[in-house]
Amino acid sequence: MAKKKGDQYDSDGAEDQDYDEEPVFEDPAGFVDDVGDDELLGDFLKQKPCESDGVENVIVVDNIPVVGPARFPKLQGVLEKIFKNAGTIVNIHYPKDDEENTKGFAFIEFKNPEMAEEAVKAFNNYRLDKSHTLLVNLFSDFQKYSDIPKDWSPPESQPYKVQNDLYTFLSEPDAQDQFCVVAESTPGAVQVQFWHNTQPEPVELLTRERFTETYVKWSPLGTYIVTFHKQGVVIWGGSSFTKINKFAHSNTQYVDFSPCEQYLVTYGPNGQKIIIWDIRTGTEKRSFVSDGSSNMSMFRWSHDDKYVARMGDNAIHVYETNTFYLLDKKSIKVQGIRNFSWSPTDNIIAYWMSEDIDAPARVTLLEIPKKIEVRNKNLFNVADCKIHWQKSGDYLCVKVDRYSKSKKDKKDADVKFLGMFYNFEIFHMREKDIPVDSVEVKETILAFAWEPVGSKFSIIHGEPSNANVSFYEAKKGQEPTMLRKMEKKVCSHLFWSPRGQFIVLANLQMGSFEFVDTNDFTIMKSGDHYRASEVEWDPTGRYVVTGTSGKVKEDHGYHLWSFQGRILKRVNLKNFMLFLWRPRPPTLLPDERQKEIRKNLKKYYAQFESKDRVRMTRASKELLEKRAKLREQFVEYRAKRVNDWEEQKYRRMQLRNNMDTDTLEADPDNVEEEIVEILVREDTTLLE
């Protein structure tokens, strides 16, 4: 046991323990160590020397053309141009015969093994020309496959492991949502609490101390929660959040799930690799070397997990997830590409390319896997573009920052744009030939947001201290029409309800919020949460949470609001870091069944109200019992303190010259009485 410094000596200054005796560090009898070296020393054991060191960063490229000395430089240039895309090449060796002709294969050495693995995945079966398809293998694989034993033995059957039910959170009888609260309990130790959002008081499900080292993140459908550790990340699930799988990637800074939760992407620190994992098996599907720049969400997924894409130099690299090879074994060349984004419901990529000397800027919609341009729009005098998909995939908005003129600064190479104005190009994705409408705004744009379910979109424009909020609607076959312009609003962010119709106008610097119903554009309620830095809607659109993170030195915690802006709960939590609602998967009910339920919703009201009354009655009874118990505890505590106070009376009188000062009447000669008159109000009554 560790001892405090002050406990090393007793009151006489003598040592209370003989420290000459050596401590015993042996394990107690019967101790079983269930933690292996791989888990404790994973990073260190990776550096253990092995026989393959020195050759694991070498690849063998077979089926290259056999050429003589005259054509050799051209072959050399072509292969170097291809394989330098996988990483830094250290050396290339071309074996030759007596006549200096190449033998049809070559050895390429890369800077590290990760680059060699990337070259194998990217360029194996690469079609060089009509007669030559490259076969690429790791040099170390030759030894591995040559050591396969001749006598085959069947694999041993493994005992069946009972799997956790990962979807118990969806079977809650009243469909109450879950949320987690993250707070730093001690420096370097993060506590995570899991709650059910029951009314009138939430019910705590579980509390995990030291659950993560930094923060947590839910998967898109709410099946898993991921935690971050020095050795890598771990995903948890089930009713008690048991460990599902772990992924060894040291110092992971960020993770990203695919939309259908089949794959997980872990991003290491700048300069390290990025890994795509299969969530269920825990196997590494593909790895990439970071270029050292900001790489958060560098990979973007199609809605069905069939494709993943990333942007390169004048190209989009689209990979098929069944093999993680490039689609059609080649990238999509796009000169001057600046950004791209997948449709949330279709395999369509929207990208924009900047202006060139002889060509305007351009927005293009590309259908995958056919690589057919289904729509494009030329744009002129473009400084920047932002791509905004509507959640249902019905509309696409491209915010275009345009300028009247530009000039180049003599001191630096930066271009300055003058006379800025803004266009919103609205693509109607469900209509024939995808018509495009344009909305022009002269004022500075502060924020833009689509209604997730519906056809409205909102814009904050003007000066931050005196902004306007405009609401538009994009109807089929019509140009977008302005529904309402709300003037002189001090807001900076827009947060739509996931069910549409309701929106929160937020100013995260001042902590002020306005709750608006966009059916008639009434402001239902306004509220404040000083220094709030985050806003989170629950999946049902019934509740909103605002929170103050650890960046604020005081008033940590979160507020729970109804969708109408009524404050329901204030929670102050020391070192509060994060509040996250648990996502829900899409409903399995078909559209026809949903419409039928909405049509007959009134007949369910009585049932819901009855449940609410029973719940509130039960909650009121529990609340009264809780208060009575707290009162009993207080009375008991007060009685103990009064008893202690009475026992200390003799000591108090000793300190006060044997004078009893417990009551004013004890020593009337030592009491001064002063009468103070205060004028509270003066009334004048006229008598007629």
UniProtKB/Swiss-Prot annotation:
Main location group: cytoplasm
Keyword Secreted carried by entry: no
Record keyword RNA-binding present: yes
Acidic residues composition bias: residue spans: 9-25
Molecular function, one GO term: translation initiation factor binding
Single GO biological process annotation from the record: regulation of translational initiation
Any one Gene Ontology cellular component term annotated for this protein: eukaryotic 48S preinitiation complex
Annotated stretches, region: Disordered: 1-28
Compartments where located: Cytoplasm
Top-rank taxon, per record: Eukaryota
Repeat positions for WD: 208-246, 247-287, 291-329, 332-367, 440-482, 527-572
Keywords: Coiled coil, Cytoplasm, Initiation factor, Protein biosynthesis, Repeat, RNA-binding, WD repeat
Coiled coil start-end: 612-643
Domain RRM, chain residue ranges per copy: 57-141
Family: Belongs to the eIF-3 subunit B family.
Assembly behavior: Component of the eukaryotic translation initiation factor 3 (eIF-3) complex.
Function: RNA-binding component of the eukaryotic translation initiation factor 3 (eIF-3) complex, which is involved in protein synthesis of a specialized repertoire of mRNAs and, together with other initiation factors, stimulates binding of mRNA and methionyl-tRNAi to the 40S ribosome. The eIF-3 complex specifically targets and initiates translation of a subset of mRNAs involved in cell proliferation.
Protein name according to UniProt: Eukaryotic translation initiation factor 3 subunit B
